[in-house]
Regions:
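Extracytoplasmic small-molecule ligand-binding "clamshell" domains
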Residues: 58-64, 68-143, 330-332, 344, ...
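Bacterial lipoprotein signal-peptidase II cleavage site
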Residues: 40-49
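C-terminal motif of bacterial Sec signal peptides marking the signal peptidase cleavage site
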Residues: 34-38
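Extended ligand-binding regions for polar small-molecule ligands
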Residues: 40, 53-60, 104, 108, ...
Length: 395
């Protein structure tokens, strides 16, 4: 602590100072020191707040993924291109299917148009093993690739899933006449795709029945099909819907679809759902509303064929709410469109229904009874028809 020069001289001359004078001096110096420390802390905190404010402003300026998609003008969907009916490329890069229609539906909602919808989507084929890494890396915006919703994918993989768009179950496909039940498949080789829930389910199912098997894993269905044709596998296990699609396109020179049998046993539950990054909940909520919207539209009888009629006369109940028309508020007696707060235009479902139709239309167009897959609705029927497809209310 430095002593003022005048005081030093006074002390040196007199040789001593009264105790009361020393006490006053020390008190004054202590107060000055505390004030200096407090000022320094205030400056540090102010600097920290300024830095934090700058960072928050930068994040706000950056916007969300939904904002980025709107700015970009296209929606990038990670898809499959090897599963007939769901995501399949017959050649020339023309991928189509059940999941592709959901990509179209999402784009129709985001951009609120049904015009030239394929110009608003970018389909990015991705294999099962790399789909989550690619999502985290920002290679695409939304995963629409027959993906099972599980706890670890929801948590560790960082995926925010939407309402399941297809409830499935794992099955086993074999050559006709070789096996009648999975219980007969002891000491067999089973082909499976890597990076899927199918691998784990296969091991669990066979272990529970004390069956020995050799798993032969492949990265994609093209490699797996080649191995199956070569006789390297006694069975091919995957989601039943996938096996139905693959069977429907089985080469004629290998016996065609009639040469294969999908056995009746259901090896697991497979709720298939679209997903996006769990850091992008605005996008997740917006697209989840689309999945629920097409299911609700089927329940209410609104389709691609009659949506324009309902736009002209929507009433004031659930159909009006679905289509973004004014809805009667029983408390106020007034009518106004519902404010969903989803980052979408209020009438986004009109564009969705014009582009792809309701859930039943999408199902029947790609995988239903009159397609090569010939799937029945089963548990994917509406809850009013004995299934478990059930949409949240548009309220």
């Amino acid at each position: 602590l430095l002593v003022p020069g005048r005081l030093q001289k006074s002390i040196s001359r007199g040789g001593k100072m009264r105790i009361g004078g020393w006490a006053k001096l020390l008190t004054l110096l202590l107060v000055l020191a505390l004030v200096a420390v407090a000022c320094e802390r205030d400056e540090e905190e102010a600097g920290g707040e300024a830095a934090g404010g700058t960072e928050a402003a930068a994040q706000a300026e950056g916007g969300t993924l939904l904002d980025e998609i709107k700015e970009r003008g296209t929606l990038r969907c990670g898809v499959n291109n090897t599963v007939p009916g769901f995501g399949f490329d017959p050649g020339g890069g023309n991928i189509d299917g059940f999941d592709i229609d959901f990509c179209r539906a999402f784009a129709a909602a985001i951009f609120n148009t049904s015009d030239n919808i394929d110009d608003l989507i970018e389909l990015i084929p991705i294999d099962a093993d790399n789909r989550f890494i690619a999502l985290q890396n920002g290679d695409y915006d939304v995963l629409v690739r027959n993906t099972t919703w599980t706890t670890s994918r929801d948590g560790a993989e960082g995926v925010a899933f939407m309402h399941p768009n297809f409830y499935d179950g794992q099955a086993m496909m074999v050559r006709k006449g070789e096996f009648d039940s999975i219980n007969e498949m002891n000491d067999t080789s089973i082909c499976v795709t890597t990076g899927t829930t199918t691998e784990l389910n296969l091991a669990d199912y066979f272990a529970e029945r004390n069956l020995e098997f050799e798993p032969i894993a492949f990265e994609d269905n093209t490699q797996l099909q080649r191995a199956f044709i070569q006789g390297r596998c006694d069975g091919w296990t995957s989601d039943r819907s996938q096996l139905a699609g693959i069977r429907s396109q089985w080469p004629a020179d290998e016996g065609g679809p009639e040469s294969l049998v999908i056995m009746d046993e259901v090896m697991s539950k497979e709720p298939l759902a679209p997903g996006t990054l769990d850091t992008e909940l605005e996008l997740r909520d917006a697209l989840d509303a689309v999945v629920n919207g097409v299911i609700l539209a089927e329940e209410l009888g609104v389709s691609s064929e009659n949506v324009d009629q309902f736009v002209e006369d929507p009433g004031s109940g659930p159909i009006a709410a679905l289509l973004g028309a004014p809805v009667l508020d029983p408390e106020t007696g007034e009518s106004a469109p519902i404010e969903h707060g989803l980052g979408l235009d209020g009438d986004f479902m009109v564009s969705v229904l014009r582009a792809v139709g309701n859930y039943g239309e999408i199902f029947n167009r790609h995988v239903g009874p009159n397609t090569d897959l010939g799937l029945q609705r089963g548990i994917n029927a509406l809850w009013t028809e004995g299934g478990i497809q059930y949409a949240i209310p548009f309220r």
